[in-house]
Amino acid sequence: MMTRDQFVRQISQEQAALRRFLTALCCGNSTTADDMAQDTLLKAYMQLSQYDERKRFASWLMKIAYHVFIDNWRKLKSHAEEPIASAKFIQDAQQTDNAFRYQALYLALESLSEKVRITILLHYMQGYQVKEIAEITDATESAVKKQLSRGREELKKRLKDE
């Protein structure tokens, strides 16, 4: 079983990737992403006894983050009229061009179905392989491949229109 010190070391290595993943899922809303990251870390620590050390720690952590996101999304969906993605973009004059590019990307990602968006983010932002994504999202490898293909096509179409 992983010790507390080992857990802290692993978390420090994966924290930036976890935050990037959740920020992308939250369409750039870093406040919501930070809250979800805290929830994820707390759940991971509470479930540490369930971690199988034969598997990658990062995959296990992302699976927890995925479930935290889904839980939060469902809560917000049932309580709010607008989706999570009231994305906040950088107002700095120097970064306006980048903000517009990110905004277009976030809006394109937001237009994807939840499953496809998560699959795209895990693969292209986090670098996970199809097999790992299938494990994280409780899907088959075939379904993950279809979601990646569908997501690429949708993103091409939406970003081309921009």
Predicted features, each with a name:
Residues 1-9, 20-39, 49-50, 141:
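Short, charged helix-capping/linker segments at alpha-helix termini
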Residues 86-110:
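Acidic, proline/glycine-rich intrinsically disordered inter-domain spacer in sigma factors
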Residues 119-123:
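A short pre-motif secondary-structure segment
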Residues 115-116:
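The N-cap/first-turn positions of alpha helices
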Residues 137-161:
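DNA-recognition helix of helix-turn-helix
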